[in-house]
Structures are given as C-alpha cells and as structure tokens.
Regions:
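Binding-cleft/active-site segments that stabilize strongly anionic ligands or cofactors
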Residues: 137-183
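Hydrophobic, ordered structural segments
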Residues: 16-70, 175-183
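Single conserved hydrophobic/aromatic residue that forms the stacking wall/gate
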Residues: 184-195
Length: 196
C-alpha cells in the first residue's frame, strides 16, 4: 500500500505501540477477519501481550461470530452474512431472488479460503445457515478444500446432484485477493467442464 498509494498503515505491533504512546486507556479492537482461525488467534495473542498497558481491552468477534462445536451451530452473524451475500449475488447476477435463480437452474457457490484450523467448521455452519434460510441453491466451498466436504470436487458433486446447470462463483472472503481472482477468472471451457 505504501509503495502504491504512498500511505503508511501500521502493522499490529506498531498500532499497539502507538496506542500505548498516545495514552489510550480503553482499547477496543474490531478485527477484519471473516472467522476465528490462525490469524485471529495470532491477533488475540499479540493483544493479550499488551493487556497490562491499558485499563481495559475488548476484542470483537470476527464477521461470522462465534464458532461453536459442530456444523449445526449458527448465529445471527452468520445469518446476516448469508442474507447479505445471497441478496447481493442475486442482484448482480440479474435475479430477483434466490428462488428465481433456482427456477432458472442457477446455483451460487460462495468460496472461502479454507483452513486446517479447528475453526474450519465455520464453513459447514454457513452451509447449515444457507439451508436453514431455505436457500437450496447456495453452496459453500473452499479454495484449500478444508474442511474436506467444502473441496471444489465435493461442491461440484452437490451442485450436480441438485440438478443445477448454471453456477455463479462468488468469494466468501473479506479480502478477495489472488484466490478470488483465480476463481472468478476461470476460463469459460474450464467452468463448463467443472459442471458438465
């Protein structure tokens, strides 16, 4: 960012040091993480190392909220995200609703990064959330294929079994960098072969 935009952005330690130097007493941290995972754990560990320098420290949940123990655990955060991403995806694909897309034979696959962290159950929870909202043509996949049931080949099987002929790929990522670009810019023949 600095080289491109001539804008300096602190890393976490620099930001924490600056907060201490500036005399911050009550630190509130709003992470930009999608879910609990290795990066969220690293962030909380770093912040915990500074707790004695503040009167209070509060760390907010990531976008998808608490993890829970299994795929059935959903929450209001996951529901809000599921509704927002499906509403946006429908509109951008030219459909009035997910039901209208389903009637047209179109499924939406929302691709996350994937992780070997125990929080990977979050992806299965998002699939459960989609199903609980009645979104039968919404599927959750991961680039890394972790958890295994979110691997591309597994998601393709689910889409085929459900009878959808068209697929709209969407990132389920806060920062949609190289992974999202590689998904969205898959060539037409490759996209066709994934579903055929």
């Amino acid at each position: 960012v600095e080289a491109r935009d001539d804008e300096v952005i602190d890393n976490m330690q620099q930001a924490l040091d600056r907060a201490v130097e500036n005399g911050v007493k009550n630190l509130v941290v709003q992470p930009t993480h999608l879910m609990h995972g290795a990066e969220y754990d690293e962030m909380t560990e770093a912040i915990n190392g500074y707790k004695d320098k503040f009167e209070s420290v509060a760390i907010a949940e990531p976008m998808l909220g608490e993890v829970g123990d299994d795929a059935t655990v959903i929450n209001d955060d996951k529901k809000a995200v599921a509704q927002a991403i499906t509403d946006t995806a429908c509109k951008e694909a030219g459909f009035d609703s997910m039901d209208a897309a389903a009637e047209a034979g179109t499924a939406f696959v929302f691709m996350g990064h994937g992780t070997s962290h125990t929080a990977n159950v979050t992806y299965d929870q998002m699939q459960t959330q989609m199903e609980n909202l009645g979104l039968k043509n919404a599927f959750i996949g991961t680039v890394e294929g972790k958890p295994e049931d979110t691997a591309c080949d597994k998601v393709i099987e689910k889409v085929k079994e459900a009878g959808y002929k068209n697929v709209v790929l969407r990132p389920l990522m806060v920062v949609a960098g190289d992974h999202a670009l590689s998904l969205i810019h898959i060539s037409e023949p490759t996209r066709h072969s994934l579903i055929s």
